């Protein structure tokens, strides 16, 4: 690989200016405040409750075993949700700081395979869907031709799920 070309590519990517997408920021913030599960956003784990204990738990071994299994499942779900919930909160904290800035840039790096990645891990153009949705180009440009629109439509259909691009009328 010609290193000057690689460096030029990285520098070009790093010149892209970003801003926080305010409507998406407000939506995610409201969902988090109201424990509303939307897409990949986790509910607040503190709102998850253990199943009620059966009235005959002391005398019915089968009921005790079943309740323990259900409670164990809830505890596991709480642990997984807590991890995701904390990650979303950290992303939102970054977005809160960045939303008051007129625009910002990402530093990028490349690995030994020459794949390019943004250095920040949480709020970046290559992280989770909700994180990417919080970002928008400061200076957007219209899509070029119908091929650009088709690629955009197919990507959106894939995110929606269960859509065969061969069946799309584009």
Where are these regions (language model features)?
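Non-catalytic nucleic-acid-binding interfaces of large nucleic-acid enzymes and RNP effectors
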Residues: 1-170
């Amino acid at each position: 690989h010609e290193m000057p070309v690689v460096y030029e590519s990285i520098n070009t990517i790093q010149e892209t200016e970003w801003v926080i997408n305010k409507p998406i920021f407000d939506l995610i913030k409201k969902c988090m405040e109201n424990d509303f599960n939307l897409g990949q956003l986790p509910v607040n784990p503190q709102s998850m409750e253990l199943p009620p204990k059966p009235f005959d738990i002391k005398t019915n071994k089968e009921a005790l075993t079943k309740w323990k299994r259900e409670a164990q499942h809830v505890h596991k779900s709480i642990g997984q949700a807590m991890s995701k919930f904390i990650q979303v909160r950290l992303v939102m904290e970054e977005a809160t700081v960045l939303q008051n800035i007129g625009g910002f840039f990402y530093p990028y790096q490349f690995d030994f395979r020459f794949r390019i990645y943004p250095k920040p891990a949480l709020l970046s153009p290559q992280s989770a869907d909700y994180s990417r949705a919080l970002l928008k180009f400061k200076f957007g440009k219209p899509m070029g031709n119908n091929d650009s629109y088709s690629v955009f439509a197919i990507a959106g259909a894939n995110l929606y799920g269960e859509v065969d691009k061969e069946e799309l009328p584009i």
